[in-house]
Structures are given as structure tokens and as C-alpha cells.
Amino acid sequence: MQFLLSGYYGFGNLGDEALARVIVSELRARYPYAEINVLSARPEVTAHELAVRSTPRAQLSAVRDAIAGADVVLSGGGGLLQNATSLRSLLYYAGILRAANRAQRKSMIFAQSIGPLDFVGKTVVREWCKGTSCATVRDARSQQLLSSLLRDIRIERTADPVFLYDTPNGAIDLPSLGVDGAVPLVVVAVRKSPGFQHAARAIAYAVDRFSEKHHAHVAFLPFGGSDDADAATELIRKCKSSPVLLPLTNIDEASALIRSAFIVIGMRLHALILAIRYGIPFLAVAYDPKVSALCEDIGYPLSPLWKYTSARSFTARDVDVLVDRVWEEREALASAVAAHAEQMRRLAQRNFEVLDELVRA
């Protein structure tokens, strides 16, 4: 049995690297004799870190050979079938599925968020992804959208595989990262996006509120590598307080940091997923529908700190209320988040159960 995994792998995005690690681990547990091949921007690094075969994703002849050699092609996880990033990105991922289906390989849209898609994007998914064997998606909105485009395949709503991620044992050395371990830690994970300047003002105000009223230590975690570090640096300049920018790290250290946090402020979806995984209350920054969908899925009682559909401005009063509430209600929120984490872990396992059914078919 040979699996080919297509996703945003090898770019140094910690959330996607966590996805790859969980998926590979689960495949090994279920199919111990299978061969796993991961399409990657840095195949040497991916092959070393995951102990798999890895094919350079930009070498189309090598990708075609990898598809031809696979029994099952998995597209995911993540938000691959969308053209908010670019039409080129959508064509790449939809093209992998089209090639797999033309080669009569079993194929699966695996644990994805679908959209945003404009008219052209919907046409690409409808025409290029038809014939896909089955699909699992991370939220109800994605299920509804994909069902309208691919009417003849089974589509099940599950949850992100990163809910199954396990941080290695051992406490992280916070002082070595410039963090006072004796003071409550607020971890912030931001990224550039449309509307970032508006979101940044709300986040900076919240950071100052945590620092000045609640005496927290605030640290920015660059989840998406150097691009996120640049976004964090820009945001830190807007703060009156003195938050720190943590060094670029690996997913084990990043998840340990989130697990040790008092509160998380997250634009990055997988930073929020790890916060939920470890029962850490959070303030979401909903730059994309997938962030709003995650909050809705767990019934999170706090509104996002900023939302892509909201007015471009924010009120200091609204931010004050959210910051003070997450701080004062932390224990109750932590218990609620932890309870939902178990449900999301069960849903995350469903991705692999659906895959098992496909393999046996």
C-alpha cells in the first residue's frame, strides 16, 4: 500500500508541519507496512523529520510519477481548496486530485476547510475534483459548500487532525526564551492577511490591556516562520507595553509554549486548535471564515477580538470587556474548552476511519 500526501508541507509553517506529523503517525499506526510519500517544498527536510519518502512538489514530472505510484492520494489537511490565496494555488491542489482521478487512483479530500471560492474557484473545484472518492471537512460551512459543488461523493464533517497532536513530555525552559515563568503568559500568534492593519490595532490594544491591567507577560510566537515574525514585529511597534518576539522554533517547542500559556490570542488556526487541545482559553482573531467556524464548532462564548466581516474600526470598550472577561473567567472557560477538546479529538479520528473505509473498498 502506498499513500501520497498533498498539502502545504515543507514551507516552515508549524501548523502544517503538525498536520503532517499527525497524519503520518496515524497512517503508520494503521498501515505499518505502507509506504508514505509527502509532496514538499523541502523534500530533504520532510524526509528526514518524518522518516518518509518525499517528492519535490514543484517538479511536475516527479509529482506525476508519485501519483502513478500511489494507491491512495490524500489532499490535505488544511485550507487547500480556496482561491483567497491565489488561483494558482487552487489550480495546483485541484490539479493533484484531477491527475489522481484520471489515473484511477483512490483519492480523498482529507480534513480540509473549503473556500473562500469565487465563481472561477467554484468552477475549478466542481470540474477538476469530480471523481474524488470521498471527502472529510473541518466545519459545517465547508461541508455545505463542497456538497453544492461535488454532489456525487460522500462528504463527512470531522475535525482537524491537529486535535490529535501530542506534545512531547518535558517542560519548556521559558527563561531561556526571554519569558518570565513566574508571571502569567499570554501567547500571541498573528499572520499577515487582508485587513491586518485594522486587526493589528485591536490586538495591540488587547496586548497592552493584558500587560498593564493584568500584569501578564505577552510573547509573540511566529507560527508561520519569518513572515509571521515580520507581522509580529510590525504589531509590537504599535504596542505601548513591551511584549517579546519569541525566536523561530519547531512545532514541539511551539506546542509546549501554548500548553504553558495562561491565555492565547490567535489568528493562526492551529495555534487556536492547540489551545483548545490543551484546555487554554483564547481570544480569536477571525481573519478567515475557518477561524469563525472553529469558534462556532466548540460553542465558544467569547466573540472574536476582530472579525473579517466586521467594521474596520474597533472600540476600546469592546476590547477591554473581552480581555477582562477571558482573564476573570479563565477557569470556567478552560473547563469548557477542555470538554470540547475531547469531542474534537473523536471527530479528528473520524478522518482516519473514513480513510480506512476507502482503503478497504
Predicted regions and their residues:
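Active-site anion-handling motifs in enzyme catalytic cores
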Residues: 1-361
